[in-house]
Amino acid sequence: DRDSCVDKSKCAKYGYYGQCDECCKKAGDRAGNCVYLKCKCNQ
């Protein structure tokens, strides 16, 4: 689910958030991005 993306997805310092984005999409969100090195899913 969406909350597990925050724990599972590593966010690199410089904007690489492919893992986060993928995880959020699987959880049913449109996209994910990184805020302060944490994965956030966009509804």
Swiss-Prot record:
Organism: Centruroides limpidus
Tissue spec: Expressed by the venom gland.
Record-given protein name: Potassium channel toxin gamma-KTx 4.7
GO molecular function: potassium channel inhibitor activity; toxin activity
Disulphide bridges, residue numbers: 5-23, 11-34, 20-39, 24-41
Record comment regarding domains: The presence of a 'disulfide through disulfide knot' structurally defines this protein as a knottin. Has the CSalpha/beta fold, which comprises one or two short alpha helices connected to anti-parallel beta-sheets stabilized by three or four disulfide bonds.
Family: Belongs to the ergtoxin family. Gamma-KTx 4 subfamily.
Domain of life where this protein originates: Eukaryota
Protein task: Reversibly blocks Kv11/ERG potassium channels.
Cross-referenced InterPro entries: Ergtoxin (IPR012622), Scorpion_toxin-like_sf (IPR036574)
Subcellular location: Secreted
Chief place of localization: secreted
GO cellular component term, pick one: extracellular region
